[in-house]
Amino acid sequence: SQNNIFNFFKKMLTKSRNIFVIKISIIILNSLNLEYNIELLEIIKILALCSEFTLLGVLFIKTLKNIDINKEIYELAKKVYTWGKMACIFYLEANSNEIKDWILNESTEENILYNFVAITYSDKADIRKRLKKISFKKNEFSKISFLIYSLLFLDAEKGIMFLDYKEELLINYLERAKIWLKQN
């Protein structure tokens, strides 16, 4: 029965020492199309703190019903690093200024991965809109500059050349850079 399957794989999450058994357990539990279960969610969130399981944890969270999925992913993203953070940000909806600011701030913290995440971070931090502003918060322009650099550094098919609005982005960046240099 589905209940037996659920109980078996839930037990495997906490008892197994084999990474692949744990991953398979998360995937199978995810496929059961479960209602919100706080005990299981807490187990998955603990496992997701390890970057080995973060992506599967996020995918599990995304299928749950009756919870604020974006809030759960955002809270997890603030606790993980490198690959785990990248997985969270990829699935995180940047639907508030708080989240957009956080993504912008995190973009330079994860600089070992900038080749992979520059477009995602730039989009979700909304640097296109930010570059239309007159003034910036402390360090905001430096972080935007890092993302612009990262976009320029990437291969043409992955970086700024991929963006439909690259000219607008670069023109706005150069205009803001002139103003920023005069002020600092």
Question: Predicted regions span which residues?
Answer:
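Alpha-solenoid helical-repeat scaffolds
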Residues: 1-37, 43-48
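Residues within HEAT/ARM-like alpha-solenoid scaffolds
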Residues: 16-24, 48, 52, 79-83, ...
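Eukaryotic acidic, Ser/Thr-rich intrinsically disordered low-complexity regions
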Residues: 94-132
